[in-house]
């Protein structure tokens, strides 16, 4: 009998939609209070997930959704880096 592997699902903090964990980008507030983009998904700290969509990133920055989810001010450089990552995956 074959076992069906469970796919871990996570919710985008901006849209509220659920996606498989590997399809989302994780942004982490480290224990030191820094904000980093966790490409591997193993970084230590409080994480929030975003869908890989430029509109989602723009909305997160405009509404400060990541700031609220991570309980810290997210620098503009993080949003720029997120856009760059998404742009590389598209093109």
Q: What role is predicted for each listed range?
A:
Residues 1-5, 88-91:
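Short, Lys/Arg-enriched, disordered terminal segments
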Residues 2-9, 34-48:
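Immediate flanking context of iron-sulfur cluster ligation sites
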Residues 58, 63-91:
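C-terminal structural segments of small proteins and small subunits
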Residues 49-50, 58:
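Short hydrophobic-aromatic micro-motifs
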Residues 12, 51:
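Short cysteine-rich clusters marking metal-coordination/redox-active sites
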Residues 18-21, 54:
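Cys/His-rich metal-chelating microdomains
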Residues 20-37:
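Short recognition patches in nucleic-acid-associated and regulatory proteins
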Residues 15:
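Metallo-beta-lactamase
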């Amino acid at each position: 009998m074959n076992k069906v592997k469970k796919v871990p699902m996570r919710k985008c903090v901006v849209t509220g939609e659920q996606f498989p964990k590997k399809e989302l980008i994780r942004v982490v507030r480290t224990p030191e209070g820094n904000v980093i983009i966790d490409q591997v998904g193993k970084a230590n700290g409080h994480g929030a997930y975003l869908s890989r969509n430029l509109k989602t990133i723009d909305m997160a920055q405009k509404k400060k959704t990541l700031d609220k989810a991570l309980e810290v001010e997210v620098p503009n450089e993080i949003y720029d880096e997120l856009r760059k990552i998404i742009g590389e995956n598209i093109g």
